[in-house]
């Protein structure tokens, strides 16, 4: 029995019939791991097809992780698991409690409908570039966290444009891709505006912004808010003892700095929420109880993952801002 048999009366397109033929051969064990497939030219000539039709079929099988190609040698069987229609490439910056929420939300939507491979670039531009280059052409969809890395659009340009989705952070170079992202400048300004009445009890507002991982939009929203209401403010890159004084309020994106500010305040007998104020970024259950509650600005990470999962499965491409809110607690 031939691997591929084209039925002119079939309701399936010819390239899909090629795909189904390979799937049948895998399920019937007529093809095994690392077996060589017939060449594109051979399949085309034997079935009266164009090379483009066969290439389209083989490309889909590659994206689903069923076959792989070696330049100059041909196509070979990579996997016998053909039950998933989609093989997804998911690139995160790092794994922390917030990103785990995104991942769990994404999995909740995807369930068993697709095969998923997850990678991490750890904010390293070279690792990002390498992972993108090595994945090109091997997956049906690419869900990518570019974070604040420079020139990510150059690496992403190697991927099929119609298969790319951007997650969490986007930028002007990536604005043409569908995304579920945070609007950092808008969220910062809106959050501070909502607690403006509390800020009148303090003298100066600080944003602790190291600039390594944090989005620049945080700075933009912070500075715009402070300029509009003429509130004394400063963007600092690290915490010094002399910053922690009565009347200071700190916006803290990084939890390491949150611990540092609290420790310095305790050493100097400063009460959180009375002598100094704290607004932390990204809510977790622990922040409900630390120092009787830490005020937070946070997006819904789990919902972000679910929204992206729905978008990938539905094929409905949009650019969506994930909602953010400020949770007022005793630290302000």
Q: Where are the regions that the model predicts?
A:
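Periplasmic-binding protein-like
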Residues: 89-90, 138-147, 205-210, 246-254, ...
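Amphipathic helical "hinge" segments at domain boundaries
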Residues: 40, 64, 75-133, 139
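N-terminal helix-turn-helix
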Residues: 32-69
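Hydrophobic alpha-helical segments within soluble ligand-binding/sensing domains
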Residues: 170-206, 258, 297-317
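Flexible loop/hinge segments that line or gate small-molecule binding clefts
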Residues: 148-186, 282-292
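An alpha-beta-alpha
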Residues: 190-229, 320-332
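Extreme N-terminal segment that seeds HTH/winged-HTH DNA-binding domains in transcriptional regulators
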Residues: 1-45, 319
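Flexible loop/turn connectors
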Residues: 246, 256-332
């Amino acid at each position: 029995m031939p691997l591929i048999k084209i039925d002119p009366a079939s309701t399936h397109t010819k390239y899909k019939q090629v795909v189904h033929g390979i799937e049948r051969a895998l399920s019937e064990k007529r093809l095994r791991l690392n077996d060589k497939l017939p060449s594109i030219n051979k399949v085309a000539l034997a079935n009266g097809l164009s090379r483009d039709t066969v290439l389209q079929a083989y490309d889909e099988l590659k994206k689903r992780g069923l076959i792989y190609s070696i330049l100059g040698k041909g196509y070979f069987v990579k996997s016998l698991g053909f039950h998933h229609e989609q093989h997804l490439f998911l690139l995160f910056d790092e794994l922390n409690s917030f990103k785990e929420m995104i991942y769990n939300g994404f999995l909740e939507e995807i369930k068993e409908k697709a095969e998923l491979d997850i990678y991490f670039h750890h904010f390293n531009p070279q690792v990002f570039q390498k992972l993108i280059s090595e994945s090109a052409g091997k997956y049906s969809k690419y869900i990518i966290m570019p974070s604040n890395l420079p020139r990510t659009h150059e690496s992403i340009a190697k991927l099929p444009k119609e298969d790319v989705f951007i997650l969490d952070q986007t930028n002007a170079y990536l604005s043409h891709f569908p995304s579920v992202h945070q609007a950092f400048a808008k969220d910062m300004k809106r959050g501070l505006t909502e607690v403006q009445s509390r800020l009148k009890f303090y003298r100066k507002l600080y944003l602790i912004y190291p600039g390594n991982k944090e989005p620049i939009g945080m700075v933009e929203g912070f500075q715009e808010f402070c300029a509009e209401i003429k509130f004394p403010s400063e963007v600092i890159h690290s915490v010094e003892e002399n910053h922690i004084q009565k009347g200071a309020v700190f916006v803290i994106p990084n939890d390491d700095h949150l611990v540092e500010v609290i420790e310095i305040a305790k050493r100097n007998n400063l009460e959180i929420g009375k002598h100094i104020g704290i607004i932390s970024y990204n809510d977790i259950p622990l922040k409900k109880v630390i120092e009787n509650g830490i005020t937070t600005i946070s997006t819904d990470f789990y919902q972000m993952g679910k929204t992206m999962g729905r978008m990938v499965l539905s094929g409905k491409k949009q650019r969506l801002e994930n909602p953010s809110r400020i949770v007022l607690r005793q630290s302000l």
